A protein has these predicted regions:
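A generic "cationic amphipathic patch" detector
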Residues: 17-20, 51-54, 112
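Residues in flexible loops and secondary-structure boundaries
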Residues: 15, 19, 61-63, 98, ...
Length: 140
C-alpha cells in the first residue's frame, strides 16, 4: 500500500483514495506502507497546469469571499472524485481572480459552477493537441 506524504491519499493497489473506508484503514494498519506522491501532488510538484480559470469584473470585488469559497468547494469535491484534480494557485489580478488547476476538467467545472451560481458570461478555449483549457468568466 502507498500513502501520499503530502495529502494523505492512499493507493489501494487499484486507485488513489482520499477518504479511506474502515476496511482500507485496517488493511493499511496491517501492511507495510510506502510513501509516494499521489498524482495530484506530483502534478503540483512538477507545476503541471492543465487549466486556467480567469474570473473578471466588478462583481468579483464585491463578492470575492463568496466566489473564492465556491471555487474551493468545487475543487474539494473534485478531489474526492479525482485525486489528480487540484488547485495549483489562486491569485488576484486586477479586477479578478486567476485560478490554475492541475486538471482541465476541474477548470471546466469551476467555470460552470461559478456561472451557475452567479450568472455572467462564460467561455471555454480548449487546446486541440494538449490537455489544457482556458476558462473565462466575466460579470460587471
Amino acid at each position: 500500500m502507498k500513502v501520499c506524504p503530502e495529502c494523505g491519499a492512499v493507493y489501494d493497489g487499484h486507485h488513489w483514495v482520499t477518504e479511506p473506508d474502515k476496511e482500507l484503514l485496517r488493511k493499511l494498519a496491517k501492511s507495510k506502507k510506502e510513501k509516494e506522491l499521489c498524482p495530484g501532488c506530483l502534478r503540483i510538484e512538477r507545476q503541471q497546469v492543465e487549466g486556467v480559470v480567469t474570473l473578471k469584473g466588478a462583481f468579483i470585488d464585491s463578492h470575492l469571499e463568496e466566489v473564492e469559497n465556491l471555487v474551493r468547494r468545487v475543487a474539494k469535491n473534485g478531489w474526492h472524485q479525482n485525486v489528480a484534480a487540484r488547485i495549483f494557485e489562486i491569485k488576484r489580478e486586477g479586477d479578478g481572480l486567476v485560478i490554475e488547476t492541475t486538471d482541465e476538467h476541474l477548470a471546466e467545472r469551476i467555470g460552470k459552477e461559478v456561472e451557475k451560481a452567479f450568472k455572467g458570461d462564460l467561455e471555454f478555449k480548449w487546446q486541440k493537441k494538449d490537455r489544457f483549457v482556458r476558462v473565462s468568466w466575466q460579470r460587471e
